[in-house]
Amino acid sequence: IKTGTWYWQLTTAGQALSTKPYAVPAIISFLEGRSLVYHSFILKQGIRHLSWVHVDLFNFHWTKRYFKSNKHEKKCYELMDDVIFVSNDAKNKFQQLFNVTTSTKVIYNLIDCKTIVLRANEFKVEKRKFTVCLVGRLVRQKQFDSIIRVARIFVDNGYDIDFWIVGAGCLESDLSKMIHDLHLDDNVHLLGYKPNPYVYIKCADLFVSCSLAEGFSLVVAEALCLGKAIVSTKTVGPVELLGSNSEYGVLADNDDESLYNAIKLFVNDYNKVFVYQDKAAKRSLMFDVEKTMNEIYSIL
């Protein structure tokens, strides 16, 4: 993505915002990229300025299209009083890229395990066989093409497994064609957008995340709340959530063979599913709504 592609389109709107005659206790740009650009135009309208970073910008620098240069993006972050990250690893990768002097803090995403568990029990779905569930937008970052290729490897090796992909997005037609071309219509199922994905995560035997980059991975945290055995590629958020040595879920390198081998561990030995379900339930105790809210209030 070319640096600065959209910056000049944002400038006019940002300058218009800067003329608004009001001041507030705090202004928060809760997403990277465009919202930070707008924020940089309205500094006089707020007393405190906070910006959130949700992703690994070192490995997936999708925001550069909104800035004139990396130096310009760094300057915008250094105009903030605090930059907040959703994981320690996301912060470390950010500093590798920008090395800002601004105050930085880590506050995990708000995860309400009680509500997630309640919603997972709202209704039931049925599975036919060993089932792997994935949830996310059908975009390049999530790498669902990888899991389709992995499914082909399983079929070629005589396994009969279902893969559920819950989500919608711009790559839906491409992924659907790939499934059909690889003769996987009976194994890989694009379920589309579901307002309650937790039911599908709960029903499946294994939850998988095959993303290219994640800052925290909300869906991995939600799968932990549901006590699911988890396989994830080694992106910064899941590594922090699951443990760098796969203490709470199995981490795989970002290639098809590694992902296949990690999933196969559970398919070949269902006892591992039970073991990691127990580990996930224990790990979910790290999520504390009151603690997270107090951390947010403390910086406002």
Question: Predicted regions span which residues?
Answer:
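Carbohydrate-associated surface elements
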Residues: 89, 110
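Conserved acidic donor-binding segment of nucleotide-sugar-dependent glycosyltransferases
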Residues: 244-257, 265-270
